[in-house]
Amino acid sequence: MRKRRTLTAPSHFNSMSAALNPMKMAAMQSQPTVDDSWAASISRIMSLTAGDRHKFSSQPFANRLDAILEAVVPSRKDPTHEKVLTIVNALIENGAIRRDEGAGVYDALLHRVSKYNSINTQSNLERLAGDVREAVAQQVRIAAGNLGSLTALNSFLARLPANVERGQDNYTGFLSALKLLVSEVPNTEVYQSGPHYFLQSSRNGTQTVNLTNAFENLKPLWGVKAPTMERLSISALLTPNTRLLLLLVSPFTDSVSISRDSYLGYLLTLYREALGRNHLDERTLEEVTEVSKAMGNENINNLQATLNFLLTNRQKKIPKDYSLTPEEERIVRFIQQAVSLRMMQENLSPTEALDVTAANMEPSFYANNRDFINKLMDYFHRAAAIAPDYFLGAVMNPRWLPPEGFFTGVFDFPERDNYIWDGLDSSLDLTRQDAMRFLEEKFIDDDQRTESRSVSRVPTPASSRRSSVAMASDSLIRPMNNDKNSLREIEVLADKLARWKTYKRESEEARESLPVIVRPKKYSSAISSDESDDGMSKPDKFLKFEGSGNPFAHLRPKLGRCL
């Protein structure tokens, strides 16, 4: 019997699925006219006569003619109908049309292309086909984004044993969760560095786990089932690297694949629930205490000096909002106005003004608000005694409100600034000392400084500025003890001021010391002479600047002149 040979069209799209690739579906639907090369066409035609050369000649002429024409002159590489077919397949894949509607849409598109066949139509079809290819390529790139990490992970898993001594279900479930982590999370990578494999995650900061050391640490713990009281002692066997791996894998695990009875299942469940809750109950101190007991440290008092103890047992108090009622605020304004008027009109001290205000209150008004009035008056008395400036500002300010210390009883008044004149008996001491120092520095010359330093018994400023400033500061701070010396110093300064001459007095004395020059008087004759015609022989009465007399005498009216 002759063996029948079936014709199989070669396919070059093995990397993609036909159901997800419209171009591949179109290529497979038009495979005989698209992807057959010259040699493939000759082989296909000649295979029809293989074994029986008369078989090809016995076929209908139309079939033979089409096969020969296709083998000799193949069709265009990307004909129009294949572009339309690609678009129809993409529409079906995206759900725009149903599969049974594809033939009608394909036929309508072919008719429209044949009716409006032009360069624009071909370019539009080419652009649409390019968009389909780009979308498919992007989908493939997204799906295969972690191919490198998956390859490295598979290489690492190939080195692990397929079976473990106990806890095979937990072991298999953990490996599945690790694969799911690497494949689903975009910012997770697996790479090899030397003999070790590393898992790096960048979800909340960069975190790197040594997979080789972590699985080596987990090797004896896969099937361990520890009671509740013994879990703390077993937790000491886990390294921080292994705990980080369990924390990263825990969101992808469940209670079915990994049993909660095992110790690792208990930890994964704890991590998974902790990551799923936004608010955690702070039981860190209890956990640290239990760990300390498990390690053999029975003295719990040593843990009270740690920062963890201080933060855990710190009592958080919400600040209380203190405010006055409208009635209390009216009482405060009334007392402010009354005290300020007593101080300004009657010139009373703060304490006296408060006492007079309290004594003149109406009995019924005081009885109805006794507690608040006593509290307010006590606060004002304390402020007047401790901080008079603060008391004056509180009384004079029409918008003043009591601070928090008024309600709590913890009075915190601002400290009063210490000025230089606080140590003096009166303001005259400071004024007299300042005036004396200023006059000595400005009006005493060098001879008088030398004379006063050698004769006078009272201290005078030195010639240097430094000693003068030092003595001035000492005189300001230390009050005078000897009044006689003060009076004598004032008399000396008065005598020196009497001998001091101003510029005006010096000018007058210099003018008086000069000899007096007497000029002869010139008498003008009644008859004018015209000997010279230059006009300068006779002094002009309007340009008379020298000599004695009134220069404006010519402007004075003359008596006895008749009009």
Curated annotation (Swiss-Prot):
Segments for region (Peripentonal hexon-tethering domain): 1-117
Q: Where is the composition biased (Low complexity)?
A: 462-471
**Per the record, which residues fall in region Disordered?**
449-471, 524-543
Stretch list, region Binding to hexon-linking protein? 148-261
Other comment: All late proteins expressed from the major late promoter are produced by alternative splicing and alternative polyadenylation of the same gene giving rise to non-overlapping ORFs. A leader sequence is present in the N-terminus of all these mRNAs and is recognized by the viral shutoff protein to provide expression although conventional translation via ribosome scanning from the cap has been shut off in the host cell.
- Please name one Pfam family that this protein belongs to: Hex_IIIa
- What is the taxonomic lineage of the source species? Viruses, Varidnaviria, Bamfordvirae, Preplasmiviricota, Tectiliviricetes
InterPro entries, per database record: Hex_IIIa, Hex_IIIa_N
Residues the record annotates as the site (Cleavage) are: 548-549
Q: How is it modified after translation?
A: Cleaved near the C-terminus by the viral protease during virion maturation to form the mature protein.
Main localisation: virion
Q: What organism is recorded for this protein?
A: Canine adenovirus serotype 1 (strain RI261) (CAdV-1)
Concerning its family, UniProt says:
Belongs to the adenoviridae hexon-linking protein IIIa family.
Protein name per the record:
Pre-hexon-linking protein IIIa
What compartments host this protein? Virion; Host nucleus
Which superkingdom does the taxonomy of this entry point to?
Answer: Viruses
